[in-house]
Every structure is written in structure tokens, then in C-alpha cells.
Amino acid sequence: MITVRETADFEKWMRGLKDRKTRLVINARIRRISVGNFGNTKSVGGNVSELVIDYGPGYRVYFTRRGREIIILLCGGDKSSQSRDIETAKQIAENFKEA
């Protein structure tokens, strides 16, 4: 099983989602990651990858790996804010320090 951790930025983004079903769909994808099923992902550079969620406006969750077991969820967004979200995720990954 893969350990999945969330940054404060990601938690804030999730709390800001108004639609309960959207949160459920995203959480289901995160649970699949924890068992090794990443689905539709792609690298966006800077040791950051994008998890594409084919629901609503095309939600994205950005993550990085630390070692073999830990996935850090950096931030999220949708297709309309993709470029800005990628830059934010790269910055968070660069500044991330192990607690």
C-alpha cells in the first residue's frame, strides 16, 4: 500500500470545492492511488505529475513522489487554471520539506 499525504494547499483546495460529488470522485481516485492504480497521469516537469480526473470541468490533482511509498498531493485545479496550477505545484514541490 502506498502512503498518500496531502499538503495544506491541497486540503484548502478540496475544502473549497462546493460540490459533494466532486469531492467524492476525487477522493475515490486518491484511494486508487493508495493501492497503486494511478490511472490517467502525466509528468509536467520538476518531479511533479498531473492526475487527470475526467469529471466536471476536467479536474487535476498535482503530486510528487518521495521514495517508493509516499505520494504528496500538492494542489488541485481544473483545465481552466492548468498552467497556473502546474507552476504552483512545482513551487510547492520545490519548497516541500519533510516534517
Question: Model-flagged regions — what are they?
Answer:
Residues M1-P57, G67-I71, D78-A99:
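Basic, Lys/Arg-enriched alpha-helical interface segments
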Residues R60-T64:
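Short, surface-exposed beta-strand/loop micro-motifs that present aromatic residues
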